[in-house]
Amino acid sequence: MPSLWREILLESLLGCVSWSLYHDLGPMIYYFPLQTLELTGLEGFSIAFLSPIFLTITPFWKLVNKKWMLTLLRIITIGSIASFQAPNAKLRLMVLALGVSSSLIVQAVTWWSGSHLQRYLRIWGFILGQIVLVVLRIWYTSLNPIWSYQMSNKVILTLSAIATLDRIGTDGDCSKPEEKKTGEVATGMASRPNWLLAGAAFGSLVFLTHWVFGEVSLVSRWAVSGHPHPGPDPNPFGGAVLLCLASGLMLPSCLWFRGTGLIWWVTGTASAAGLLYLHTWAAAVSGCVFAIFTASMWPQTLGHLINSGTNPGKTMTIAMIFYLLEIFFCAWCTAFKFVPGGVYARERSDVLLGTMMLIIGLNMLFGPKKNLDLLLQTKNSSKVLFRKSEKYMKLFLWLLVGVGLLGLGLRHKAYERKLGKVAPTKEVSAAIWPFRFGYDNEGWSSLERSAHLLNETGADFITILESDASKPYMGNNDLTMWLGEKLGFYTDFGPSTRYHTWGIMALSRYPIVKSEHHLLPSPEGEIAPAITLTVNISGKLVDFVVTHFGNHEDDLDRKLQAIAVSKLLKSSSNQVIFLGYITSAPGSRDYLQLTEHGNVKDIDSTDHDRWCEYIMYRGLIRLGYARISHAELSDSEIQMAKFRIPDDPTNYRDNQKVVIDHREVSEKIHFNPRFGSYKEGHNYENNHHFHMNTPKYFL
């Protein structure tokens, strides 16, 4: 039936939009404290999630059930997609918050009002909307196309507007719920779930899905370890996660499935623990089982939600309170240094995950045993339509899975073609850059511009700091995978996202032979990550040590971290490059700890105007050193160095003479002239240019 297909497609599109709005409000709020490293007050916009509380007011409930008001709310919801076109981040945040609040009210009204078939299609549209979203993110290499590109934002806005206009035409019956027979009402009242538990379970399930399955690469990033056994790569392993999510949604329709039993809950809890505590493939397999469990909870949890009472205000408000508490707690686990009460949430993702599993389990075990389909299929006259709707939704679901798998396959093939396309060389260039999670200083996505900038540097090895944006309050974006595929580099994600660091990644034009992830001593401040790597550069093995120390005020942390990294440097091979963010001045205690006890040399010991980024080395011949201004793309510059790998690492002479005229050195070791020429002092212009008395060359 074409009309059923249309209903499913339109509701799924609108469900995808709702998920996208909810996913983006967190990163937009988080952007502002990211700039100041403290709470700004704009966190208050999170109350947009609590808009269902107005539905507890009877006159307001009657008002939003009127067609003209529901039409207005639908238009506001879809219009908030255009927040991406706003001239500044604050206006974008305000428009987005308005869209989130409107979307939640629309969902509450339409889920609790209308015919059983209408409600069934709307609710399943929301569930399938999550699958639509992850499939879109596959095709956009983990990014949400609504919030990443102008063209895709406009296309989805247009399609959503068309869908909304169509829905407005069907909203006339929303204020007239389908009547239930007397026996059905009595049975429903007797088996009605607790509204408080139903709301808490729904909010927890929304956040759990957002946190762990908001993008199919996330499971791999929870399970990741160092090379040569890093665990499954997100592409193609993300396809397994997608298949498991789809399979989980189908499970409740199987007659043999006991989705309300204690055994299934124990299975889900064990898989959650496996994802949190196991490593590489064991963690990834646990994540797949957890995906099946999580998806299988959706029909039952939503069935309990809409059957918990006639007025959705209380239930939806409780749901969103739990969602907010959980996403804030998730942020507190990593940002504990900068927020009140952070000491109690430090690295306690286990408490968060355990609490959510307990809430979902209680709702599963003590609520009605009927799922969403059975609760809404009450009229004999509509059973045929329900069966057809279920059939079409299954077909649509597996069509989405096929589209997602195709996207992964095409991306994987394109990425494989890019890797290893380099000529043999004895020179290597390395760069370090604090990335700010892929957002520029104005709050917009910086990925495309950043990839272009990094490509223009010509660096062979790049370490990116502040790179773990896979967390829900930063957009669930896999920046390592995105940059690796865009630039054609081998990648190392760094310590798992479950270890509560801000992230550090490595990108290499040459194969990574082995690597090891480290969590440096951090008794007082934020968790400091490091990676040690060995890279095969045209048959020569060169070690790299990359790190991000804690903040300047955490003196003990920096002292212990410098000691730990100096040991890593000392134990590295004779040829090693250090790229670090150490928040200490040249000649300071931590600087000397690295150079003297780590047995490395500063690329330019005469550069005294540094504070954070440093490049050091041993066993190589230095050729050049450059600093490139950030031009508001981040809050920090790019530093680069060029080296030659000596033929005999035990018998060579390092370059000592410093020159600033590029004409005095071979053209093949020149830095890209696109960044201008030697410049004294800081470059205050809004362009990427050499500055701070660089570039320098060594003879």
Swiss-Prot record:
Where is this chain's protein located in or outside the cell? Membrane
Q: Name one GO cellular component term.
A: endoplasmic reticulum
From the UniProt entry, list the residue stretches annotated as the region Required for function in lipid remodeling. Answer: 607-627
Among Gene3D superfamilies, the record links this protein to:
Endonuclease/exonuclease/phosphatase (3.60.10.10)
Where do glycans attach?
A: 455
- A GO term (biological process) for this protein? membrane protein ectodomain proteolysis
Its topology with respect to the membrane?
Multi-pass membrane protein
- The membrane spanning regions, by residue number, are 13-33, 41-61, 93-113, 123-143, 196-216, 237-257, 273-293, 316-336, 349-369, 390-410
Question: Which InterPro entries does the annotation name?
Answer: Endo/exonu/phosph_ase_sf, GPI-anchor_lipid_remodeler, PGAP2IP_TM_1nd, PGAP2IP_TM_2nd
Swiss-Prot/TrEMBL keywords: Glycoprotein, GPI-anchor biosynthesis, Membrane, Transmembrane, Transmembrane helix
Q: What is its main location?
A: membrane
What family is this protein classified in? Belongs to the PGAP2IP family.
Task: Describe the protein's quaternary organization and the partners it interacts with.
Answer: Interacts with PGAP2/FRAG1.
The free-text function statement in the UniProt record for this protein reads: Involved in lipid remodeling during GPI-anchor maturation.
Protein known as: PGAP2-interacting protein
Question: Where does this protein come from, organism-wise?
Answer: Homo sapiens (Human)
Task: Supply the gene name.
Answer: CWH43
